[in-house]
A protein has these predicted regions:
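N-terminal intrinsically disordered, cationic/polar leader segments
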Residues: 1-111
Length: 111
């Protein structure tokens, strides 16, 4: 069975509340920089959003696996009902986030 695995240890735990109007990914990236976090996990995320832009996965005919489709936009109010992800960095030390979120719109539709 092919897989990649990495081991880590739980160190600091940081609780974060972003101010209203803050872009979630930009806010998380800035929080990581301020806290000196190069690698980590996002264990949970919830909240209310004015709107959201996101991408769904799509098959790519020229590449194994999946990629991302067109950017979709929802206007608020939007509930962030669940979020989790990883924090890593590239060779230049820039913070990279990979976050999955479940969203609910005003009509009860899940996104």
């Amino acid at each position: 069975m092919e897989m990649e695995m990495a081991e880590g240890r739980l160190g600091r735990v940081i609780a974060l509340r972003l101010k209203p109007g803050t872009d979630v990914l930009l806010g998380l990236t800035e929080a990581c920089k301020r806290a000196g976090i190069n690698n980590g996990v996002i264990l949970s995320a919830i909240g209310s959003l004015d709107g959201v832009s996101y991408c769904n996965p799509v098959e790519l005919p020229t590449k194994a696996g999946y990629g991302y489709g067109e950017v979709l936009h929802l206007t608020g109010p939007i509930e962030l009902t669940s979020g989790a992800g990883i924090i890593c960095h590239d060779d230049e030390g820039n913070t990279n986030l990979h976050v999955h979120m479940s969203l609910s719109d005003r009509y009860g539709n899940a996104h």
